[in-house]
């Protein structure tokens, strides 16, 4: 399993991955052909297509209670892409949102700090999308082992147990990589991945007490809720 070290701003290094060998064994052992499908990028039906439609304006208004916790961004285009990313679900990033973010991140602007904040959020979104797919694949493998009604419940095979433990370590190390000034981003990641981690916990008895650190809604310490932002 690769190490997950980062410098203070190097969000690109925060890739959450179970080791290739473990994932290869996991997907090969799962009897469900579509097990690796979550790693693909679906096109969402209700995509956030840009900064000028009514849906995008509603998302901006929902950010009002959290403005003081977000980085200051002076460039309007960069700010719009940043807020649209924060308000979107990272389970499947819409292509239109990816295009918007890349366009804003590649433009020439004097707002270097705002551009860096956008890049950090975009990298985190892509990492969560990828790792979320791995967690779904792992959950599906557990479901296949247990059976529809739990008739096959028994000790976990070693490769599954190793994958579950690896997923937990990757998740916690990723959260710990965020600095105090990135609390808003940490909470967003908790929101996106916490539920998927809880799904794994629910399917495995005897997990360590450290799993109690995983929260379903990571909004403690900030006003408002990112769940509301995606409503």
Curated annotation (Swiss-Prot):
UniProt KW Mitochondrion keyword: yes
Pathway per the UniProt entry: Carbohydrate metabolism; tricarboxylic acid cycle
Topology with respect to the bilayer: Peripheral membrane protein
TM ranges: none
Highest taxon in the source lineage: Eukaryota
This protein's UniProt keywords: Membrane, Mitochondrion, Mitochondrion inner membrane, Transit peptide, Tricarboxylic acid cycle
GO cellular component: mitochondrial inner membrane; respiratory chain complex II (succinate dehydrogenase)
Name of the protein this chain belongs to: Succinate dehydrogenase subunit 5, mitochondrial
């Amino acid at each position: 399993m690769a190490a997950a070290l980062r410098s203070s701003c190097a969000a690109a290094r925060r890739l959450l991955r179970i080791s290739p060998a473990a994932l290869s064994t996991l997907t090969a052992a799962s009897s469900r052909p579509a097990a690796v499908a979550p790693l693909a990028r679906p096109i969402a039906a209700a995509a956030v297509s840009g900064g000028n439609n009514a849906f995008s304006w509603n998302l901006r208004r929902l950010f009002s209670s959290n403005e003081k916790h977000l980085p200051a961004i002076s460039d309007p285009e960069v700010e719009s892409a940043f807020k649209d990313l924060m308000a979107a679900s990272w389970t499947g990033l819409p292509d239109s949102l990816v295009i918007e973010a890349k366009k804003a991140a590649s433009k020439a602007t004097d707002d270097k700090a705002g551009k860096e904040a956008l890049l950090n959020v975009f990298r985190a979104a892509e990492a969560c999308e990828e790792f979320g797919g791995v967690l779904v694949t792992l959950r599906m493998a557990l479901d296949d082992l247990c059976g529809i009604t739990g008739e096959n419940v028994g000790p976990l095979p070693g490769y599954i147990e190793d994958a579950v433990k690896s997923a937990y370590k990757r998740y916690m190390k990723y959260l710990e990589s965020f600095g105090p000034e990135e609390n808003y981003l940490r909470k967003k990641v908790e929101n996106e991945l916490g539920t998927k981690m809880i799904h794994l916990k629910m399917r495995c008895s005897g997990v360590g007490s450290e799993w109690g650190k995983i929260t379903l809604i990571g909004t403690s310490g900030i006003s408002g809720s990112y769940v509301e932002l995606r409503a």
